[in-house]
Amino acid sequence: MVKLSIVLTPQFLSHDQGQLTKELQQHVKSVTCPCEYLRKVINTLADHHHRGTDFGGSPWLHVIIAFPTSYKVVITLWIVYLWVSLLKTIFWSRNGHDGSTDVQQRAWRSNRRRQEGLRSICMHTKKRVSSFRGNKIVLKDVITLRRHVETKVRAKIRKRKVTTKINHHDKINGKRKTARKQKMFQRAQELRRRAEDYHKCKIPPSARKALCNWVRMAAAEHRHSSGLPYWPYLTAETLKNRMGHQPPPPTQQHSITDNSLSLKTPPECLLTPLPPSADDNLKTPPECVLTPLPPSADDNLKTPPECVLTPLPPSADDNLKTPPECLLTPLPPSADDKLKTPPECLLTPLPPSALPSAPPSADDNLKTRAECLLHPLPPSADDNLKTPSERQLTPLPPSAPPSADDNIKTPAERLRGPLPPSADDNLKTPSERQLTPLPPSAPPSADDNIKTPAERLRGPLPPSADDNLKTPSERQLTPLPPSAPPSADDNIKTPAERLRGPLPPSADDNLKTPSERQLTPLPPSAPPSADDNIKTPAERLRGPLPPSADDNLKTPSERQLTPLPPSAPPSADDNIKTPAERLRGPLPPSADDNLKTPSERQLTPLPPSAPPSADDNIKTPAFHPQRMIISRHLPSVSSLPFHPQLHPQQMIISRYLLSVCGFRFHHQPMIISRHLPSVSSLPFHPQLHPQQMIISRHLPSVCGGRFHPQRMIISRHLPSVSSLPFHPQLHPQQMIISRHLPSVCGGRFHPQRMIISRHLPSVSSLPFHPQLHPQQMIISRHLPSVCGGRFHPQRMIISRHLPSVSSLPFHPQLHPQQMIISRHLPSVCGGRFHPQRMIISRHLPSVSSLPFHPQLHPQQMIISRHLPSVCGERLRGPLPPSADDNLKTPSERQLTPLPPSAPPSADDNIKTPAERLRGPLPPSADDNLKTPSERQLTPLPPSAPPSADDNIKTPAERLRGPLPPSADDNLKTPSERQLTPLPPSAPPSADDNIKTPAERLRGPLPPSADDNLKTPPLATQEAEAEKPRKPKRQRAAEMEPPPEPKRRRVGDVEPSRKPKRRRAADVEPSSPEPKRRRVGDVEPSRKPKRRRAADVEPSSPEPKRRRVGDVEPSRKPKRRRAADVEPSLPEPKRRRLS
């Protein structure tokens, strides 16, 4: 037993706080005590000592502490501290003061007379008590308070013991406090609050009143000694008079002081336990939270915390609320157990529910131990038809003598394939059962050849006789249960891993059979004939197969190129059997083609019936790079890539197809039906000879099995389509074509991928082989936005209603190109490229561009609006116009050469080869208000000589930046007009620009007179940034006609003052016309800043430029078209070929 003697004398307590703390700590260090509460109590005692108290006249006070455990020291020191505080309070009222001269005593002497007779409010009882200290405190109150403090200290010790135990347990097991432990602490707090209330009720009101005043005085003394603002003996009523409001109720941490004092109390003052009050609510200080209450009859769920760690005995109302550590052992079966058993109990075997002498039942299999279940369990008798698919592989319980079905009981690890179907399977069985072979039920027959190894099967299997009409495509490979002697259907029993291709169609397939039936041979029913070639191995087939005899009148369009059976001497149609690699052009038309033949007949060379004429270019066969025929009424047209090292190909696209797509192929023609709602192309072997793509008309869905080079999944109404990989060493392709697919996605494949859809909300592009020259095309009609990643050579994004179109990079070593075709795009831009040029109509609903070999010669694609098909071989210029062209001819007519009917003029330059055209052609007079956006980058000419027309002749590659804007640009002018130079206001006139040779035009032509007033936001921002002030803008109608006319447009020039504009080549060297200078070369003094129309004052001698609607009709004659020009004029009428 260790004894510690601490002597507390008045001289010892009169020391300052720092010295007292050091001396007490020296005594504490001399004692080997493991408890940390000893130092904490000593420090608290040093902080709350009272100087000047003689402790009842006693010279010193010896405190003998004997502790067998460390907690006895804490209890004894707390009692000593309480006695010291109470003795000081009691004797303070008797002694008054000791004559000291410090601030505290002087404040006491000054306030005693003012506080005499006043009554304050107790913070606990909320009653008015006397402010005199030391009265009505008897020995009974002290003893009651001592018992309460002891209970409070024991609660602290109990809390520490429980916390130490739990923390030690968590430290060993490496776990944190669980929700159950937290609930245990909350219950302990509730027990502690009940104990507090129990002891507070035993304290008489007289002791409570005195203690309230004592606490208030001790707090004020502590603030004075610590240097904080000090109000001596501040009572609740004095605080109310000073602050002007009622003091709030005490908080949980500071329930002993008022609001203003609690905010300034340092944290070391909160370590002193306060005596409880009888009317304290549940917000007792937290140091007594873990005090357990004595057990009562209604404490069933409020078990002490140390008893919660052991599992409670099961009760009737304990369903699933058992603690988690008690769930490690299986619970006994309950009568009200439902199917919602916790997941941790699902792996525990149930105890036997029947006696050992009871006969085994079918349900005993469910009670087998989990480690013995090496194969799936048999199904239960009450399973309905909606059992999950894993039940199909579960063997049935033995209920009959051994039969053919006993193979199902084979262990799962020995089953090499799926199990056979059951007799009671309905028609809606999942697809995995369809590939299950049937048990042997007949001797081998001649049809067992289907079991031949797959490497020896050179062609598809014959069709089956009992295929129904609406069977899904995966059921074609599903064997039927044996119901007859061996027949041709036994081939279906071949294991699925030996089937190298899809099974042939059935003989009773209706007209909606999938397209794979077209290439499937019929079963032998006659002596060898011409149809036996179908059984020839695929690598030996040099041409397409002939049609079948039972094809109805609605056969797809591939019959047009299909040779008929030999019924007549050789004719011109036999050329169809020629290998595709030897066909340099399209085949001639057939005799039975009706008037609605697809557009491929338009490129078919006709027999010679007339001498060569200008129209013979349309009949020219395929040319070196490519030929494209694009119909007039196609809502969406897709472009097709091809082999880069081979010769050209011909793509024939029908007129009324809703969706047309093609894919990369070796060297082949493509025939596409006319009325197909969905068109798909079929893949084939890439290393073989020609091929033919047959596209069905009435098939709702077309699918094929996996084969060597490619796979194609085409569907019309599929909600989702996924692509499958194929041979990586070949040059295959995968095409996913759908009409109503909400989303289309596919995996990466070797060369390229095309995703074409009409109503797809989103289209994503995929990468492909980087060493080839493939292409990715995303064509859509109603896509709100189209984006794609970078790929090897090119990318084309074609859309009709896209709000924005962005160009993508492509092969860096080649001469790239960028083709962006759109009808209603607010801005259209295209880069200069080496191989080809595209002239795109303005009114086409959908236009598609085609890439070609980058090392070949250039190409020009002319897409007409009213021509059903236009093509040419190695055409250096566009085709001549037709006789039936209306006034709304597309813009490509501007480059159409006129037949030689007059001496050489400026229009002859339109026949210049496309590769020499440096810029777009000038706009026509009949252009509507929606001028293309390529005029946005065209600079305006300066407002002073050198004239603005010279800038147009400057080479485009020397222009470092756009030209400055014009001063008379209105706010609603189209964006392409902002940088467009205006024509000069004197001869040579601005209309001559149209006649300028195309190869000498370095920039876009000036705007037309009928441009609308909708200026883009870019011009408004630039103009607003430049102008120093913004006066009120006046319209042209409100201004008086100025004496000096404005700069007139092309349409404003009178015919008499409009001489023919000379070309750049016609200008003599001595011409005073200076060379066009760049923006940076113009001197600031000669190039004043052009003002906006809004900045021009009404009194300015040079008014602003008026709009088109403000020009008087008499001064703006209507611009005549080419057809309205009389023959007597110097400018000849553009004549047509007819």
UniProtKB/Swiss-Prot annotation:
Stretch list, region Disordered: 241-263, 291-620, 873-1138
Subcellular localization, as worded in the UniProt entry: Membrane
Natural source organism: Homo sapiens
Entry's family note: Belongs to the NPIP family.
Protein's UniProt keywords contain tRNA-binding: no
Any one cellular-component term (Gene Ontology): membrane
Main localization (coarse): membrane
Descriptive protein name: Nuclear pore complex-interacting protein family member B4
Regions of compositional bias (Pro residues) in chain numbering: 349-359
Record-annotated membrane-spanning stretches: 63-87
Membrane topology, from the record: Single-pass membrane protein
Biased composition (Polar residues): 252-262
Biased composition (Basic and acidic residues): 406-416, 448-458, 490-500, 532-542, 574-584, 908-918, 950-960, 992-1002
Keywords: Membrane, Transmembrane, Transmembrane helix
InterPro entries xref list: NPB13-like_MII_rpt (IPR048893), NPIP (IPR009443), NPIP_N (IPR054697)
